[in-house]
Amino acid sequence: MLSRDQHCFTFAKRFSFLVCIRIVNMIVVKVGGSDGIDYDAVCADLAERWQAGEKLILVHGGSGETNRVAEALGHPPKFVTSPSGYTSRFTDRQTLEIFEMVYCGKMNKGLVERLQRLGVNAVGLSGLDGRIFEGKHKDSVRSVENGKVKVLRGDHTGTVEKVNTGLIELLLGAGYLPVLTPPAASYEGVAINVDGDRAAAQLAAALRAEALLLLSNVPGLLRDYPDEASLIREIPANDVESYLEFAQDRMKKKVLGAAEAVAGGVGRVVFGDARAGKPISAALAGEGTVVS
């Protein structure tokens, strides 16, 4: 009988044999899309660890570049804040098309190219491909504007509720490094904008990852943002949500994603700094905020 960490799959039609791989010590790395991130440093560190035999998956964002492209195309971004205090991008159809152009195109292929130059056979995919990420399409969103709650319709967003790991496991088993990005697929097959941190958390849980690294342009969760000296070093796994009070802006989604990841069985989550050095190695060494 196969252990819980073994995954077997058949390469049908072209190949008639069964291939079994053992995925252990999986590391899911999510790198954000805000200004200041050193993607060259992230890719160099990732390549070094991959070539040393570690199993990694890279998930990425692209918010900063999406904002710039949207402005240049005359369709500036619109952000909404929910009654519970979470900020997200309002995604009408035109915004979704810009989002896909940047996330699936410029950002994804830019990272794949960096990794290929470093000798890593990376494959870039969105969560829409193979329905890797699936969730319910949310057509409307509640937004607080001038102290009043409004309902905005025509939104193309959702939350990842299901991760289909078969394609990812096939790629890993064949020696490829997956580079993933939103959007996800709705249950009706429509592209939906989803939060990348929470998608990465769901992916890490589905793969029973040893670690989920959430890398951004800050050193971790700060008790007194933006004072980097106020870095919170450790968060107990059973008390993550109580630290939401210290999270500002998009960090709220990272904390929420961390809570979901550890609840789903991920060994540890680290909020790390992607601005320089060896971001992945530093996070794995405990630099940043460690949730365990």
Swiss-Prot record:
The keyword Cytoplasm applies. Substrate binds at residues 89, 193. Pathway: Amino-acid biosynthesis; L-lysine biosynthesis via AAA pathway; L-lysine from L-alpha-aminoadipate (Thermus route): step 2/5. Keywords: Amino-acid biosynthesis, ATP-binding, Cytoplasm, Kinase, Lysine biosynthesis, Nucleotide-binding, Transferase. GO terms for cellular component: cytoplasm. It comes from the Bacteria. It catalyses: [amino-group carrier protein]-C-terminal-N-(1,4-dicarboxybutan-1-yl)-L-glutamine + ATP = [amino-group carrier protein]-C-terminal-N-(1-carboxy-5-phosphooxy-5-oxopentan-1-yl)-L-glutamine + ADP. GO terms for biological process: L-arginine biosynthetic process; lysine biosynthetic process via aminoadipic acid. Its EC number is 2.7.2.17. Gene3D superfamilies: Acetylglutamate kinase-like. It is found in: Cytoplasm. The record marks 30, 254 as: Transition state stabilizer. The keyword Transcription does not apply. GO terms for molecular function: acetylglutamate kinase activity; ATP binding; N2-acetyl-L-aminoadipate kinase activity. PANTHER family: [LYSW]-AMINOADIPATE KINASE, N-ACETYLGLUTAMATE SYNTHASE. This is [LysW]-aminoadipate kinase. The gene is lysZ.
